[in-house]
Amino acid sequence: MSTAEDITQERVVDIMRDERFVMLSTATADGKVVSHPMTPQEVTDGANVWFLLGLQGDQADAIRVNPHVNLAFAETGSWLSVSGVAEFVEDRSKVAELWDGQLDEYFTGPDDPNLGLLKFVGQSAQYWGVPGGGMVAAVKIMASKVTGSEPPGQMGTVEL
């Protein structure tokens, strides 16, 4: 696998914007790493991500204790891991702006007192990818084993 020269902040942001779901990993007070599926409400050009979440619960408690978190994005043939810091933001107008009717299942509306606004500030990202994704990637990897050539794909790290 070669080092990717074209893994830039812009590319990271594009990948983040393309994914509907992400795993948000936190560390609990006793040191356990726990991941939760989340839906990014907005991804900024600066690699910051806005989420809406419940203010009462294990996930919010873990972030209050240790705001250093990780976001994991995956699609067929590529993976992105972004580390950063999460912070709770008091901004009801931003909550209303980001409100999605699909959240009705979890909250009574954008004014629900348990509904919180979380801003993730990305600091560093790691990317692994194989062109063509899924089956094409598997064939290319097997071919590299048979021929002894370098496996296809790229990896890279970028500070955000």
Kindly give the residue locations of the regions a language model identified.
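N-terminal leader/targeting segments and the immediate start of mature chains
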Residues: 1-20, 157
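A short mixed-secondary-structure module that forms the rim of ligand-binding clefts
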Residues: 41-77
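Histidine- and/or cysteine-centered catalytic micro-motif in compact active-site loops
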Residues: 27-29, 54-56, 74-76, 83-87
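Structural motif
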Residues: 48, 68, 79, 85, ...
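Charged, gly/pro-rich active-site loop segments
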Residues: 1-4, 85-160
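A short, Trp-centered hydrophobic/proline-enriched beta-strand micro-motif
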Residues: 14-30, 69-73
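Hydrophobic/aromatic beta-strand elements that line small-molecule binding cavities or substrate pockets
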Residues: 38-41, 86-87
